[in-house]
Amino acid sequence: MLAPSASISRMQREVRNGHRGAAILLTGLPAAGKSTLAQALHATLFGCGWQTVVLDGDSLRIGLSRDLGFSDADRQENIRRASELAALLVENGQIVILAMIAPLAELREVFAQRLGEDYREVWCSASLAVCEQRDPKGHYARARRGELAGFTGVSAPYEPPLQASLVLDTGTQTVEACLDRLVTWLGECSVLHKT
């Protein structure tokens, strides 16, 4: 099956938006600060007139992927769906901010393969101890009690990215400091380049 051709090209959309489309994956342990940083980046870019959208892993899990669990196959399918949605949005000139654990290198590679040169990977690096201390949803505590099987960081692995485009120390740096570094870096790597 072939996708229909668009009557308005990506280049036309990007000219109208004043910037190119791109996808930025914020990956890290649960409670590493991905969603907080994604929302801060979204607000900053929106305030500057950029067309942005946040795809948060938790939101996708209660909507688009509500039929999926946490088996290896379900995690793979969740990432596939998110990468396809991100690709559609990027093609329409959006800057897509993905806040997802994406715990394994092979899962992050799905994004890299699907999104190609439009993809940037940012590791929100925070120690397991810091993430467990934060535990805003009580998931770490539940996982430690054996109530959550396959919870990343406790009973399922998180593979730190070896090829992340940017590493942010979200465990010790403030949200503001991480946001400032992220915005500066996005400018340096031409994601925030006016067309």
Model-derived regions, located:
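Conserved substrate/cofactor phosphate-moiety recognition/catalytic segment
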Residues: Q39-A87, E91
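Small-molecule kinase domains that catalyze NTP-dependent phosphoryl transfer to phosphate-bearing small molecules
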Residues: S125-L128, Q133-R181, E188-K194
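Hydrophobic anchor at the beta1->P-loop junction of P-loop NTPases
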Residues: L26
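Conserved lysine of the Walker
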Residues: K34
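Extreme N-terminal, non-catalytic leader segments
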Residues: M1-A23
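Residue-level preference for the first positions of well-ordered beta-strands
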Residues: G21-A23, Q51, I95-I97
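The conserved Walker
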Residues: P30
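ATP-dependent NMP and nucleoside kinases share a basic, alpha-helical "lid"
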Residues: G63-F70, D74, A86-R144, G150
